[in-house]
C-alpha cells in the first residue's frame, strides 16, 4: 500500500532532477513513512545514480532550504544551531547508527 502522491515516483527522479539543476530535498511525514527510513530514500537515490555528496546535501542543507530554516540549520556554519549527528561509517548506510548526537551543541550521549 502506498500514498497516491507516490504513484509516479521513480527511484531515478532525484538523479534526473539534480542533473537538470533542480535542488532535491528528502523529507518524510513521519506518521506514514517512519523518519528512521529517511536515509533509505537517500540510499535508493544513490543506488539509482544520485552522487553521494548530493544525497547528503539533500538530507541536510537542501531540506533546511525547502523548510525555510537554512539560516538556522542544515550545515556546519558559525552562527547556526549545532544540531549534529556524528558517524564513523557512511551516514546513508541503512543500518548505521550515529556515534554521537548533539542538540544545540550539547552531546546527548
Feature roles, as predicted:
Residues 1-87:
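His/Asp/Glu-enriched, well-ordered alpha-helical/loop segment
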Residues 65, 77-109:
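C-terminal cap of metal-dependent C-N hydrolases
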